[in-house]
Amino acid sequence: ARLLRHLRYIVVDECHTYRGVFGANVSLVLRRLLRIAKAYGAEPTLIFASATAADPAGQASRLCGREVVAVTEDAAPTGERTIALWEPGFIEGAEGENGAPVRYPATTEAASIMSTLLLEGARTLTFVRSRRAAETVAMRAQEDLVVAGRADFADRVASYRAGYLAEDRRALERRLDDGDLLGVATTNALELGIDVGGLDAVVMAGFPGTVASFRQQAGR
């Protein structure tokens, strides 16, 4: 009761992720919380945060049922970004259906690009679509680095995905935070919630499914 009586702010981070059935449930929870707070005499201010929502005011309004003022002027310092599209090359001598040429898999190319960036001194985060792909890309990048004579770099490449034990996940996050890891192949588990600083490059092996996810991953 004391908390509700003195409630001043409710902060909802990454509000663009609350959509569909999940978003409807969050919306109901927020509205119920506001009604209970009002019953205790509190009128908390709602703060919604998102770096990728196409219509931030509309999204926030749908979640809370109130009129929302959008603050869209970005004053955060950001460096210049370059977005490049990479098409995998053809596998020499390989033929597909009806003799069609076959391209290298996206994961193979992603690992090659990742290792090249690491050799150039760029801390790199590589997003893939599955847990298995995260393990595969990290392993292939390590192999490329060893072949290039940088086994020391290979030891500083890892994969990150859901399903790890909590202590293993925290250990990887600490290595990311302190700069010990130079390269990480990950699923969308690193797309949200964890601050990854000091990155130089992001590789996406395929379109992540939504424009919001693309912006979120590219902005890491």
Residue spans of the language-model regions?
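Helicase motor core with emphasis on the C-terminal RecA-like subdomain
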Residues: 1-220
